[in-house]
């Protein structure tokens, strides 16, 4: 077997049972990975220097094809209502078949870290059969110093073979696509999908499983911090496509990370060393920091259409998918944190993409309301972020990231509530979805409005304004905010048909109530009293 690059020879591919490989390219950096990806016709060059790849039929995650090995160690630890399972024997067969499929192939390996805090990080080795996948995951996770590679010993191993086709009868899955995690062996197998996001979310899922036991709260959120001497941080929870990356990229604040973080007794820390930003309808004027990364060597653009002659990206072209993305190292953002760490948050923002158009652009939550809305995780699945999703769909994704949370939501909710109370954190619910009507009749909340409201929340001025109680949801909504039209703050005033608004709001409240029934036995009376209808009746 030929080896190219630097690695710990005492812990090579044989340690995971990968044998008879044609070659392994170890820890290659961007220039070499560009060469390999272009030589293999895996990708193209865009004007400006980014590498552009397409992912075929899988242009988003495949959550229904994700499985956890159900064994003695996980039986009572995993939330099986939300996680598919396979047996240890089925996983063993799958792993053997992955090994057989890899024989004779050239693979690319990256030795990386998940977690900027050395006390709470995982050493993740990622094997891929595509060179551009290797660059993608190198961009997204944290890269060790080259001098440390010779002593690197992996804790978690990911094997990503898009050309592998699973056999449902043999492997216990439902299709030819499979994402299987064995927490006991610390192995992840990804087959039948070239969507690169599966790799990063597998690391996230692993950390979401192991960290709560150490008292660390893993979070599907972005984070930034003020540039002044206080350095106070803010967290932005939200499902993919709700604005986490866009809103945390603020030139007036330091970016900690755009998607995955931990909150320990020492503060917050990024799980990653890069960003994975949506690029559909990306604008140089509206999102200059992200736009600039698409014109840099080293960035990977996924399913972005480029002109066949000029190689200029067309960010308005959704012919491949709405879920177009770019992946780049965190240091491509000028104001990004060099450490990926910050102190305890002063503010938490829960982003919801309200597909009904009845929620206000911002609301202040009590501790109990924050717990309620965190467990509810109301949002809309935005087109393209999952396979087969072509239009926004109202949903409840508990913890604002149900597909990645292997444990019961109450584990994460209780940790969050405890940390919020301990550090006196203000919590805000922000609607980046629709206003003036639902999907098809209303319009998306203007980003300038969201940015203005967030600025007021983060600098402390919003907490000082007059608030009213929302008649449907019970939370506190600002009456006036300088620089924002008063009408926008009151959703009913943006609808021409007030009766239709009332009917729609009532329907959404009913959805909240039905969804939360599964959590009622896991929360106290204060959280149950934060239920929208209960709050409205009490008013």
From Swiss-Prot:
Which UniProt keywords are given for this protein, alphabetically ordered? ATP-binding, Cytoplasm, Decarboxylase, Gluconeogenesis, Lyase, Manganese, Metal-binding, Nucleotide-binding
Its required cofactor(s), as named, are: Mn(2+)
**According to its record, what are the GO cellular component terms?**
cytosol
Task: Tell where it localizes.
Answer: Cytoplasm
Which is one GO molecular function term here?
A: metal ion binding
Q: Does the keyword Cytoplasm apply?
A: yes
Q: What is its EC number?
A: 4.1.1.49
Query: What does the entry list as the binding residues for Mn(2+)?
Result: 201, 220, 259
Positions with a binding annotation for ATP = 201, 220, 238-246, 287, 325, 450
Which GO biological process annotations does it have? Answer: gluconeogenesis
| Sites where the protein binds substrate | 61, 195, 201, 325
Listed pathway(s): Carbohydrate biosynthesis; gluconeogenesis
Q: Please, which domain of life does this record's source organism belong to? A: Bacteria
Q: Which reaction does it catalyse?
A: oxaloacetate + ATP = phosphoenolpyruvate + ADP + CO2
Q: Which residues are the signal sequence here? A: none
What task does this protein carry out? Involved in the gluconeogenesis. Catalyzes the conversion of oxaloacetate (OAA) to phosphoenolpyruvate (PEP) through direct phosphoryl transfer between the nucleoside triphosphate and OAA.
Give the family from UniProt.
Belongs to the phosphoenolpyruvate carboxykinase (ATP) family.
Q: Which HAMAP family match?
A: PEPCK_ATP (MF_00453)
Q: Which NCBIfam families match?
A: pckA, PRK09344.1-2, PRK09344.1-3, PRK09344.1-4
Q: What is this protein called?
A: Phosphoenolpyruvate carboxykinase (ATP)
Q: Which organism is it from?
A: Methylorubrum extorquens (strain PA1) (Methylobacterium extorquens)
């Amino acid at each position: 077997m030929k080896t190219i690059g630097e690695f710990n020879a005492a812990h090579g591919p044989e340690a995971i049972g990968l044998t008879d490989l044609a070659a392994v390219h170890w820890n290659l950096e961007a220039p070499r990975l560009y060469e390999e990806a272009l030589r293999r016709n895996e990708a193209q060059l865009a004007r400006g220097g980014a590498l552009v790849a397409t992912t075929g039929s899988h242009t988003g995650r495949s959550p229904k094809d994700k499985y956890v090995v159900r064994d003695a160690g996980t039986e009572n630890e995993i939330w099986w209502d939300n996680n598919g399972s396979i047996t240890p024997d089925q996983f063993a067969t799958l792993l053997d078949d992955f090994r057989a499929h890899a024989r004779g192939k050239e693979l690319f390996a990256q030795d990386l870290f998940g977690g900027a805090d050395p006390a709470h990080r995982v050493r993740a080795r990622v094997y891929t059969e595509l060179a551009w996948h290797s660059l993608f995951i190198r961009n997204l996770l944290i890269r060790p110093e080259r001098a440390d590679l010779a002593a690197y010993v992996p804790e978690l191993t990911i094997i990503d073979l898009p050309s592998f086709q699973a056999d449902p009868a043999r492997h216990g899955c439902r299709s030819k696509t499979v994402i299987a995690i064995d927490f006991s062996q610390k192995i992840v197998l990804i087959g039948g999908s070239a969507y690169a996001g599966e790799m990063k979310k597998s690391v996230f899922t692993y950390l979401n499983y192991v960290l709560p036991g150490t008292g660390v709260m893993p979070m599907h959120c972005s984070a930034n911090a003020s540039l002044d001497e206080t350095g106070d941080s803010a967290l932005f929870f939200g499902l993919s496509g709700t604005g986490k990356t866009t809103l945390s990229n603020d030139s007036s604040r330091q970016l900690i990370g755009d998607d995955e973080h931990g909150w320990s007794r020492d503060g917050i820390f990024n799980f990653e060393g890069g960003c994975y930003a949506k690029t559909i309808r990306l604008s140089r004027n509206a999102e200059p920091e992200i736009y600039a990364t698409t014109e840099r060597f080293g960035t990977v653009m996924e399913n972005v259409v480029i002109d066949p002659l000029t190689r200029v990206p067309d960010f308005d072209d959704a012919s491949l998918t709405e879920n177009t993305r770019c992946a780049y190292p965190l240091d491509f953002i000028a104001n990004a944190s060099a450490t990926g760490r910050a102190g305890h948050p002063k503010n938490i923002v829960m982003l919801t993409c309200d597909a009904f158009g009845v929620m206000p652009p911002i609301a202040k939550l009590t501790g109990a309301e924050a717990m309620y809305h965190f467990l509810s995780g109301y949002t809309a699945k935005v087109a393209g972020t999952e396979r087969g999703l072509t239009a926004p769909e109202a949903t409840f994704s508990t913890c604002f990231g149900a597909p990645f949370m292997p444990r019961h939501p109450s584990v994460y909710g209780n940790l969050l509530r405890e940390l919020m109370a301990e550090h006196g954190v203000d919590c805000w619910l922000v609607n980046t979805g629709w206003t003036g009507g639902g999907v098809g009749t209303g319009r998306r909340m203007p980003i300038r409005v969201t940015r203005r409201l967030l600025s007021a929340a983060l600098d402390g001025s919003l907490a000082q304004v007059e608030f009213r109680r929302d008649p449907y949801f019970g939370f506190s909504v600002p009456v006036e905010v300088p620089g924002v039209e008063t009408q926008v703050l009151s959703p009913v005033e943006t609808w021409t048909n007030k009766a239709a608004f009332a009917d729609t709001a009532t329907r959404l409240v009913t959805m909240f109530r039905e969804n939360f029934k599964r959590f009622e036995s896991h929360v106290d009376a204060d959280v149950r009293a934060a239920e929208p209808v209960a709050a409205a009746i009490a008013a």
